[in-house]
Amino acid sequence: MVALKRFRATGPSFADLVPYAGLVDNGVLLLKDGSLMAGWYFAGPDSDSATDFERNELSRQINAILSRLGTGWMIQVEAARIPTYDYPSEDRCHFPDAVTRAIDAERRAHFARERGHFESKHALILTYRPSEAKKTAAQQIHLLGRGEP
């Protein structure tokens, strides 16, 4: 029999390092420190074709919304570039006139000639960490069986 003890890691395991405790509702995670986390995928307007005024106005609106959250909130915005390998076939083209169908045919031909096409996926993740007073009260309720003596 081989002694495996020397091959075992003595540091924290993967389960010790990840912050997730459990799923409390559809799309809402409870973290080990008592925080709640939820995330959503989103798609915004094309910022490359927007004017400076439009980009600034969108930024102002987002900042105004996020500033209402108050303390205890953390915001993460993630972007992933995913390679694409196919373009919709010509029989799936639903453009109404010859000009837009011709533009789509040119795009399809360009897609077939060139390599390195990507789509962007954006995600917004909000985490709320209650203050220590609220966290302590919640822990007491949980430990005492929902406030029962």
From Swiss-Prot:
Keywords per UniProt: Conjugation, Plasmid
Family of the protein in this entry: Belongs to the TrbE/VirB4 family.
Protein's recorded name: Probable conjugal transfer protein TrbE part 1
Gene source species: Sinorhizobium fredii (strain NBRC 101917 / NGR234)
High-level lineage: Bacteria, Pseudomonadati, Pseudomonadota, Alphaproteobacteria, Hyphomicrobiales
Gene: trbEA
